[in-house]
């Protein structure tokens, strides 16, 4: 869904909103994903020289099942497993969520100069439970691969503030 247009009759306030939902199933065992996301922005002319912009976005990626990691024989040959084989467990997942909010004030001054103030805040979260195999399989004993599992949870927050004055001037 993508909606864009003026929010006031004179067009001095405009907006856009986008929402997307994507799902994927895989031929690989235990593997699928869901990806909702949204974005919105509003621009307002506060006069002939001043523009205010605010907006935000949200994105989520939910992957069910870990990425497959198939071993090979120690001589490099293929184990001839079916193409859909995934040695990870069905309970494995990899989820990411991200929020971002932003704003800007832009004012055009005399003689082509521009003054801008920008602010942005973002939050990102990762939650992953995974398992994998590593190592080669001995073709004679069928021994060798190692199995491991783990969990990762992280949060990253960021705040950015920027003030900018730009324009042409003669130095010499």
What would you call each of these model-derived segments?
Residues 1-66, 91-110:
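Transmembrane beta-barrel wall of Gram-negative outer-membrane proteins
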Residues 10, 30, 82-84, 112, ...:
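Surface-exposed loop/turn and secondary-structure junction residues enriched for glycine/proline
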Residues 29, 51-88, 121, 125-136, ...:
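Outer-membrane beta-barrel and related beta-rich outer-membrane complex signature
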Residues 31-35, 77-80, 92-98, 144, ...:
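Transmembrane beta-barrel outer-membrane domains
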Residues 39-43, 78-79, 140-141:
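Short alpha-helical linear motifs
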Residues 39-41, 83-136:
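Extended alpha-helical regions
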